Design a protein with these regions (language model features):
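N-terminal Rossmann-like NAD(P)+-binding domain of SDR-like oxidoreductases, especially those catalyzing
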Residues: 1-149
Length: 149
């Protein structure tokens, strides 16, 4: 069975994603959820699936802890949602936003690269707010496919 790490999992949206993954892929994937439990996360958001997931409390900026998590759970894929996203808080303390959103993402990527090796076919999916796509215009559409979800 493959092991998927989902970051930011105690947030409302991500907890619902984790629940969907558990319901849709139970027996195919082990879901390991990772969260620092800051103001944006609530462990009780995961209550519906707490017996079907593995919860890891940690900081995505801590390289050694992230690498230990990859090794301990033999992570095959990462779905990275963890981010500081409240605009008002970003104005009050931009350093924390840069630390989590840039350094944290880099830490997860670097640990994945070292753990999986160069040229690996393992998956790292970075999830972000819709603003990163820019304006679509009158024609076309954005699509994303990830394990059929």
């Amino acid at each position: 069975m493959k092991n998927i790490l989902v970051t930011g999992a105690a947030g409302f949206i991500v907890a619902n994603f984790a629940e969907l993954m558990v319901k849709k892929y139970e027996g195919k994937y082990n879901i390991i959820v990772f969260d620092k439990l800051t103001y944006a996360g609530n462990i009780h958001n995961l209550d519906a699936i707490k017996d079907k997931i593995t919860f890891v409390q940690g900081d995505i900026c801590d390289f050694d802890f992230v690498m230990d998590t990859y090794k301990k759970y033999d992570i095959d894929a990462v779905v990275h949602f963890a981010a500081e996203s409240h605009v008002d808080n970003s104005i009050k303390n931009p350093f924390i936003f840069t630390q989590t959103n840039v350094i944290g993402t880099h830490t997860l990527l670097e640990a994945a690269k070292q753990f999986w090796g160069e040229g690996s076919e393992n998956k790292f999916v970075n999830v972000s707010k819709d603003q990163v796509y820019g304006t679509l215009g009158e024609k076309g559409y954005f699509t994303e496919k990830f394990w059929g979800v």
